């Protein structure tokens, strides 16, 4: 009849949600995502660091329900490129999402299917609205874990394949101590 309400404790300092589904992405899980393939290969062989962890509370995939998750995106770079999440469109493209920065420093890279991109810097307290039809990826531009909360429709789904194949039209790098958003020479329109 009625679904039971749910309350869970989210540790804003660590990003951990006890009892949540946990996903761990290592650098080796992100082959082909970073521009500097040689640096990627060397770092994978040397230590294969964890790039990010996700703690998700998921509902049935049906219209009207909401999922939420925290992500802990660790600091690091491959060449000049900051660590980032794989990024995705929603499988149901007309679904939106909200992100809330809890700790650390980073940003959200967003892109339309045509490659029009936006960069939104994030720090604790920043709320980002991801409109329908936009791909999105978070980037850690700081020197500590970047932790954020995401809230999204339970039936949105994740289309990682399009990003794995085409990439983003922009990448986020460090150049002369500054965060720069530059064209991705490997982007496939």
Swiss-Prot record:
Cell membrane as UniProt keyword: no
Keyword annotations from UniProtKB, A to Z: Cytoplasm, Gluconeogenesis, Glycolysis, Iron, Isomerase, Metal-binding
Reactions this protein catalyses: alpha-D-glucose 6-phosphate = beta-D-fructose 6-phosphate
Main localization (coarse): cytoplasm
Cellular component annotations (GO), alphabetically ordered: cytoplasm
Cellular localization per UniProt: Cytoplasm
Protein's pathway: Carbohydrate degradation; glycolysis; D-glyceraldehyde 3-phosphate and glycerone phosphate from D-glucose: step 2/4
InterPro entries membership: G6P_isomerase_archaea/bacteria (IPR016758), G6P_isomerase_prok (IPR010551), GPI/OXD (IPR051610), RmlC-like_jellyroll (IPR014710), RmlC_Cupin_sf (IPR011051)
Biological process per Gene Ontology, one example term: gluconeogenesis
GO molecular function: glucose-6-phosphate isomerase activity; iron ion binding
EC code(s) of this entry: 5.3.1.9
Cofactor annotation remark: Binds 1 Fe cation per subunit.
Pfam family, one: GPI
Cofactor(s) annotated in UniProt: Fe cation
Chain positions recorded as Fe cation binding sites: 88, 90, 97, 136
Signal sequence coordinates: none
Family: Belongs to the archaeal-type GPI family.
Subunit structure: Homodimer.
Annotated PANTHER family: CUPIN TYPE-2 DOMAIN-CONTAINING PROTEIN, OXALATE-BINDING PROTEIN
Protein name per Swiss-Prot or TrEMBL: Glucose-6-phosphate isomerase
Name of the gene this protein is made from: pgiA
């Amino acid at each position: 009849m009625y679904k039971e309400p749910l309350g869970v404790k989210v540790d804003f300092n660590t990003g951990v949600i006890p009892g949540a589904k946990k996903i761990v992405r290592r650098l080796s899980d992100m082959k082909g995502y970073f521009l500097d393939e040689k640096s990627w290969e060397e770092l994978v062989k040397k230590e294969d660091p964890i790039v990010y962890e996700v703690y998700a509370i998921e509902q049935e995939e049906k219209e009207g329900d909401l999922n939420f998750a925290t992500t802990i995106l660790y600091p690091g770079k491959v060449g000049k490129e900051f660590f980032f999440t794989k990024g995705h469109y929603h499988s149901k493209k007309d679904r939106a999402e909200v992100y809330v920065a809890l700790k650390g420093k980073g940003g959200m890279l967003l892109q339309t299917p045509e490659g029009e991109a936006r960069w939104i810097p994030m720090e604790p307290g920043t709320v980002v609205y991801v409109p329908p039809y936009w791909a999105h990826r978070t980037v850690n531009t700081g020197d500590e874990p970047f932790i954020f909360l995401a809230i999204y429709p339970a039936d949105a789904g994740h289309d990682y394949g399009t990003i794995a194949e085409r990439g983003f039209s922009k990448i986020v790098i460090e150049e002369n101590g500054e965060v720069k958003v530059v064209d991705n020479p490997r982007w496939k329109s």
